[in-house]
């Protein structure tokens, strides 16, 4: 059979049209070294900083070092089964974690996988762990309070929505307790909470989760866990994962609170990764970009304006601002706040709550040192009644500490100095508060009012706690309407002052403690 040229060309065209090839563009490389959770890869020509690299066995690594002829990557999890010669490939995406309301009440790992045995997660999508913080124009000034429930904090070191307030102190001094109580106090405020546990024992985290559940706060909280036994990469990334989960609420016009417990351990994990990647060490062997490690994380905590929220939600949410408030925790060694990481985080944040070992050991809990604790922006957000009443608390405590040190050497004190010392002693005693017992605004206002207006003068020092408990019980039963008004509005005027005074006068005349 002979074919003419036309038939041949038609046949070729037909075959070309019918030709079907499935092509997959992949950038493959080969592992040339594996050690201590770090892999070195040759042959990856097109890879991004922070990109996920797919490993054999459906595992992933993150590219951190991009060198001329190799890529240094850190493995997300166990690496014992990896070997030289294994093939890897790029994915073209950076690490993302699930976000949404379905995560509330759940315990997840750094990758957003559930580890609480409650079944699969319900989520609203995925968000990258590394996100650029909102710009200056997209932000709104801080003017709404976050009540921690602690008299010492809410009166002297107030925290606003969108603020970054550092909790700093030595180990076993009540840093986590303060943060957990702040979370418990948000269960009825509408503020969604994220608790990020980095480098802690699994038993410690289990206890925290149990306490949150007991006090009804777990349903309002996402717990992100990277235990001490997990890979350094997971400990380093856990705060960023938790931040993305908190930003979900901020960007939709809601308020959220995130606790990083603690950033010292995150910095140690990052130092470990950097040294294994052969990056040049700096002060205290930390890499040069350890400041950027924390600044890019903490800058994401912000209060954003209504225009930002409307633009993000494509017009679904209008006229609402959103906020992400951060409470980072830093552990110091023997009270040394001038070490590298503490000074970095102090300079990044909007204030710090300094917890002191000597105060803790003397029985003052929370062990807040009011002299060097400060809130740089929270004053504008403080509840009106607490702001008006607490003006003299900080100065009374500061004067008391100075005079107490002086009075140890002075045998005879004048009446004014003795009165200041006695007032300071009573205020110090009043600032004590039990764990898992956050106080409402009205209860705080009544306690501070009793100190400021001199009702504690006739109370023995060891009876201050009993006096306060009886007073609050009396006010909540006999003056319930007044307490509700204070809690609802936070206002302070002549009428409220008169009612408070009448209530305390009646209590002192008729009640015992």
Curated annotation (Swiss-Prot):
It is found in: Cell inner membrane. The keyword Translocase applies. GO terms for cellular component: plasma membrane; proton-transporting ATP synthase complex. GO terms for molecular function: ADP binding; ATP binding; proton-transporting ATP synthase activity, rotational mechanism. The keyword Cell division does not apply. CDD domains: ATP-synt_F1_alpha_C, ATP-synt_F1_alpha_N, F1-ATPase_alpha_CD. Produces ATP from ADP in the presence of a proton gradient across the membrane. The alpha chain is a regulatory subunit. It catalyses: ATP + H2O + 4 H(+)(in) = ADP + phosphate + 5 H(+)(out). Belongs to the ATPase alpha/beta chains family. Keywords: ATP synthesis, ATP-binding, Cell inner membrane, Cell membrane, CF(1), Hydrogen ion transport, Ion transport, Membrane, Nucleotide-binding, Translocase, Transport. ATP binds at residues 169-176. Its EC number is 7.1.2.2. HAMAP family: ATP_synth_alpha_bact. The gene is atpA. It is a peripheral membrane protein. F-type ATPases have 2 components, CF(1) - the catalytic core - and CF(0) - the membrane proton channel. CF(1) has five subunits: alpha(3), beta(3), gamma(1), delta(1), epsilon(1). CF(0) has three main subunits: a(1), b(2) and c(9-12). The alpha and beta chains form an alternating ring which encloses part of the gamma chain. CF(1) is attached to CF(0) by a central stalk formed by the gamma and epsilon chains, while a peripheral stalk is formed by the delta and b chains. It comes from Shewanella halifaxensis (strain HAW-EB4). Its main location: membrane. This is ATP synthase subunit alpha.
